[in-house]
Every structure is written in structure tokens, then in C-alpha cells.
């Protein structure tokens, strides 16, 4: 990728989302997402199965004891203090969403990155078109325009097989 970008004299920088979460770079956008929680839920929930609808939250808290990302429902919101409240193994926890104490579910995370990084253009495989549509609705709810998009066919490896992260090809 770098060779391609350099060849055509693109200006670019690579950013680690983990570092951006932990450094507080995403904090203002995370607060905005918390303030728009219900609207985001109204966008995402209809796209989920009945069981997943019961437990879904855009926020995935990081366990304060283990550092593991918890895929558990959020029971309460504290928008004033930028906190979420959730039950972890029978223990009610209140935790900040800021400074790397949470991550976001994929489609909300994508919209957050577009928003916080002022993304102008986004390429994605045709398998992500539905995700791009939902992320577009979310960024518009947050008050910004979505980036111009370009959907491409999936890439094939030298054997003509679909490139897959899980296969490692």
C-alpha cells in the first residue's frame, strides 16, 4: 500500500485506533455518540436478529480488571459524566467511555472514525456495502456528511481465491 501511495505522491499517515482511543483523540466523538445513543440504537437494532437486539449496545466496555473487551449489554447511561453502567458477573459497574475505557461496535466505530478523522473518501469491498449504509446514517445523525464511497469487487490471490484475513492469504 505504501509503495502505491508513494508512487502517486499521495500524502498519508497511518494511525492506530487503539492509540487514538487511549490518547483521548476520539473522546469528543465518543461523547457525541453517547448523547445520540437512542438514535443510533434506532438505526442499528432493526438490522439485528431478535436475540442480538436484546443485548446490543454501541459501547463495548473494557474490563477494568482484565483489560478484555466485554460484549455485554449497557443498562444505564450517564451522559453528563460520559459513563456507561453495566453488569459484569453480577457486579454493577459504572465506567467512563473516554480514554480507551471502551471500544465501539464495528458499524458505529466506522462512523466515529469518519467523523473524528474528517474522512473524505472511503473504499470498501462489496461485502461491506450494508455496513457503509448504516455508518452513513450514523454520521449524518451526528451532524456530518459521510465520505464519498467506492465499493469494489473482492480481491483474489495468485491462485484466484478470495483474499481472507481468517485464511491468511
Model-flagged regions — what are they?
Residues 1-41, 135-136, 142:
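N-terminal Rossmann-like or analogous alpha/beta NTP/dinucleotide-binding catalytic cores
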